[in-house]
Amino acid sequence: MATGGGVTSREGLRYAEYLPPSAQRSDADIDHTAGRRLLAVGLGVAAVAFAGRYAFQIWKPLEQVITATARKISSPSFSSYYKGGFEQKMSKREASLILGVSPSAGKAKIRTAHKRIMILNHPDKGGSPYLASKINEAKDLLEASSKAN
């Protein structure tokens, strides 16, 4: 296995610290490895920088498109719900919007709509007493107008 003070290749790999200085890796080999790693890290940083620059260039027009789309979505034509506060004196139109029925709806339809909304907004179940009073006011107004017709 060992001949004349030398070490076989298998043992040389195993006991590298016992190798004679001529058989050990040179400093130049170590520098090449570090240089390759440094080059790879540098290329990675450069790639990330170029990708970031490209993303920032694309972001400006993309931001305008996103803003325009958000404005279109929030327009009233896409919403099926009434947006706005309550009027001082409730009108027939506002009452029908609150209950979600037509102003000329019959008593049965008004009552079913009132029941459905009150189940969702009842103060005993965590709903707002103010909203419940407005819902009741809307029901009373529509029922009174349907009696008159």
Swiss-Prot record:
The record's annotation in PROSITE patterns points to: DNAJ_2
The UniProt disruption phenotype note reads: No visible phenotype. Mutant animals are viable. Both male and female are fertile and do not exhibit any obvious malformations or behavioral abnormalities. CD8+ T-cell mitochondria are hyperpolarized, compared to their wild-type counterparts. In fasted mutant animals, livers do not exhibit any signs of steatosis, but accumulate glycogen, possibly due to a sustained mitochondrial oxidation that leads to rapid metabolism of lipids, hence minimizing their accumulation in the liver and favoring glycogenesis. During fasting, loss of white fat is also more prominent than in wild type animals.
Q: Which domain of life is it from?
A: Eukaryota
Segments forming domain J: 94-149
Q: Which SUPFAM superfamilies match?
A: Chaperone J-domain
Q: Primary place of residence?
A: mitochondrion
- Phosphoserine carried by residues: S102
Q: Which residues cross the membrane?
A: 38-54
The GO annotation for biological process reads:
cellular response to starvation; mitochondrial electron transport, NADH to ubiquinone; negative regulation of mitochondrial electron transport, NADH to ubiquinone; negative regulation of protein-containing complex assembly; protein transport; protein-containing complex assembly; regulation of lipid metabolic process
Which cell locations does it reside in?
A: Mitochondrion inner membrane
Question: In this UniProt entry, which residues form the Mitochondrial matrix topological domain(s)?
Answer: 55-149
Taken from the record's topology, the Mitochondrial intermembrane segments are 1-37
* InterPro entries according to UniProt: DnaJ_domain, J_dom_sf
Topology within the bilayer: Single-pass membrane protein
Q: How does it assemble?
A: Interacts with the TIM23 complex. Directly interacts with PAM16/MAGMAS; this interaction counteracts DNAJC15-dependent stimulation of HSPA9 ATPase activity. Associates with complex I of the mitochondrial electron transfer chain; this interaction may interfere with the formation of supercomplexes that facilitate the transfer of electrons between complexes.
Main function: Acts as an import component of the TIM23 translocase complex. Stimulates the ATPase activity of HSPA9. Negative regulator of the mitochondrial respiratory chain. Prevents mitochondrial hyperpolarization state and restricts mitochondrial generation of ATP.
- Protein name in UniProt: DnaJ homolog subfamily C member 15
Q: Which organism is it from?
A: Mus musculus
What are the leading ranks of the lineage?
Answer: Eukaryota, Metazoa, Chordata, Craniata, Vertebrata
- As recorded in Swiss-Prot or TrEMBL, the protein's gene is named Dnajc15
